[in-house]
């Protein structure tokens, strides 16, 4: 019995569900029950009947699942799989901003720690951030940790005043305008598709901007045959499954989030077999963080 069959057998025996983000390696995406972006997976984790969730992603995703469903066992196969951007936001810094802007609503990207979520009014993802900001009555918004997503939403909601945290995704931030222009010159008629975690200069030369799920939907529904995909290359697995006749180009030929790529089938199998790497959150902290995630599902549409 190969490891894939072992995982499927074990999953059935334990009554577990496997969730995987689009940035996971293809083998993990293929064995998962659900593959999606952060918002979609958070909804699945909240609503699923299974009491054991194996979350193949990074730590903040598994923590969000536990915050929403404390009665469920949430396993993160590789505990070291963190998020550099999430670590850029601190409780102390946010508390100071809240003191300086007492009338502002705090909107935190889901790519943030449980501690930051606990100090926030509402959480958001790249796919629902605009809806959430529009649904807030307050005009002043503290947005963290991603300055790029924040500035993108600011452009979409000009009636709001944003105080942006100076955080960013190291994978998306590394992309330079010159590389995109080079690819455009080399491939006539190519469409440029970017994640809002990209810098403004990249967004400004893109044909479409959206979350991972929105990127996949856009490409799947497009009659165009060539695309520059400016996000973590894990999305290519889904794009190639749905568009075998289409050509995809990644800046520099490589956009990899090392944390997202840590989880292997062996890690998945062993964590489920041994029931290791369970997410544990202090109940007082969880309740505070729960409010921001509850509001996300309420206001996110």
UniProtKB/Swiss-Prot annotation:
Cellular component annotations (GO), alphabetically ordered: cytosol
InterPro entries in the record: NadA, NadA_sf, Quinolinate_synth_type2
Subcellular location: Cytoplasm
Location (main, coarse): cytoplasm
Gene Ontology BP annotations: 'de novo' NAD biosynthetic process from L-aspartate
Record's catalysed reaction(s): iminosuccinate + dihydroxyacetone phosphate = quinolinate + phosphate + 2 H2O + H(+)
Pathways involved: Cofactor biosynthesis; NAD(+) biosynthesis; quinolinate from iminoaspartate: step 1/1
Cofactor annotation remark: Binds 1 [4Fe-4S] cluster per subunit.
Keywords, ordered alphabetically: 4Fe-4S, Cytoplasm, Iron, Iron-sulfur, Metal-binding, Pyridine nucleotide biosynthesis, Transferase
Keyword Iron-sulfur: yes
Gene3D superfamilies listed in its UniProt record: NadA-like
Pfam families: NadA
Superkingdom of the organism of origin: Bacteria
Family assignment from sequence similarity: Belongs to the quinolinate synthase family. Type 2 subfamily.
Protein name: Quinolinate synthase
Gene: nadA
